[in-house]
């Protein structure tokens, strides 16, 4: 068996070939202002190099890789201040919580599947969303130096009226359409390389759609690099939020520049794949991986 799993009452740790490659903290105990929610940190390559940041001083609510909703019908399931048109970021009493209700973890062969039920509650205590989240750690390839995380979520509106998913961009801040599954990279990854499908790349990918997008960064302390290859939901593709300065961040946005309405009782289903690889993969290697691992 390639994968080894350790569990506590608040986290699931996954190791491959003797290296802890991720820890999923499903009961975080975070400060309410940081928008308590589950997160993945640390996330590491098979060589043991860290590829996530946790509570950086500029954004304490950034925690590794996590599901978020920056603007949801006036509520903030992101953390910190909310962007208000013509005012900028304002600290409001609207920071919600994603609560873990039940979690199972099962290894079958060389694949670990985590299934979790969550409920989303506003700061005022209203129950708005029932979520079914499924994650899989798979395709661990020691020779290739890579492994993959598949992340799927079903968000069911139980509010009693429609929910509007938005972002700072839908509320007036240009090129800041973050919402949904969000990765914050280590400080050392600042000024990394952004490569995307179909010959695209660079910081100009902000707001553009692409089947996949990769971020290549260099580690401090060791003479190594790492690549994170993100596959967007093939049926969704709102546009990428991506920055390589002043920090490394990637997010296949739920609502980059257009709000998404989820009627009461209906479900929004999205799925993503993130490949964590040792070394700096070039475009040819990224395209080969995408071709041989269709999503």
Language-model segments: residues:
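Beta-strand-rich N-terminal accessory domains
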Residues: 1-64, 152, 162, 166, ...
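Acidic (Asp/Glu-rich), glycine- and aromatic
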Residues: 24-27, 32-42, 142-192
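Extracellular/lumen-exposed scaffold segments
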Residues: 33-84, 195-210
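Beta-strand elements of well-folded, non-transmembrane domains
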Residues: 47, 118-124, 135-139, 155-159, ...
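Extended, loop-rich substrate-binding clefts of extracytoplasmic carbohydrate-active enzymes
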Residues: 66-145
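Hydrophobic residues positioned within well-ordered beta-strands of beta-sheet architectures
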Residues: 114-116, 131-133, 149-151, 181, ...
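Active-site/ligand-binding surface loops and adjacent short beta/alpha elements
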Residues: 160-233
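Beta-strand-rich recognition/accessory modules
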Residues: 227-295
